[in-house]
Amino acid sequence: MYKRQAVDHDDAILKNWMAGIKQVTGHPDPSEYDHWDNIKLTPTTNSISVRGMTNHKIIHECWRTKRPFYYVDTGYIGNNQKRKEWHRVIRNNVQHQKLVDVPANRLVSLQQSFPELKWKGWRKDGGAILLVTPSPKPCRFYNVDRDTWVEDTIATLKKYTDREIIVRDKVERRKRVGVGHIFSQIKNDNIYALVTYQSIGAIEGIIAGVPAFTGAPTAADPVSNHDLANIENPKYSDEEEIWKWQKWLAYCQYTSGELSNGNALRILQEMELE
């Protein structure tokens, strides 16, 4: 029998997601949990659900064997408060890649709650470059050494610009929301551009009006830059492109309630989000 299994039975968000699968599929026991050592012995047609990059070995093994999986993690926008309200769910990847055109309703609702999500255009008169460093989890996932990446990135930037470079490390959550959020730092430090490996900070930077440069695949890719040689001549997507991208982001993330009532899975399937 085809099975849908989850690796961590103690994760509340993952439990919500698995409950939602049951709502949609009516599978007799989609909320089956097991250890990866047991799951990996099952047919690779059996899908699994995991949450967080600490499962990097499992995800890489799924890619290798072509086992389908759903990946759950922090949402892209709207989490600028103490508690994470939004969670992204991706099939067979860790961030969404395929931009599709979707309705505006979810974005409009988010912008009503979080006015800072309204894109106000590009800030082209900034001064410094904000270098957002990768945290330990993505470093392990992508086999990147944080210090080496910082040194190499700064060295590369200095070949093409003499702008000040401000390094921002990931700190505990309560210190990076509110006044500690990237939105605030971009304004207070007069940031010109943001450079990161694959942080959601790239998304936040673009929404705040500064071009972002990324080193690994991210959901910011449709409107971000990659070649640091272009740091003084970045791509500035037009308003229509930003609007389409933001609408898509809003459809790629869900509340705990949407995870558990099945709406998250329904949206993923109906909109063919990947």
Tell where the protein language model's regions lie, with residue ranges.
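Extended catalytic core of nucleotide-activated donor transferases of GT-like folds
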Residues: 26-83
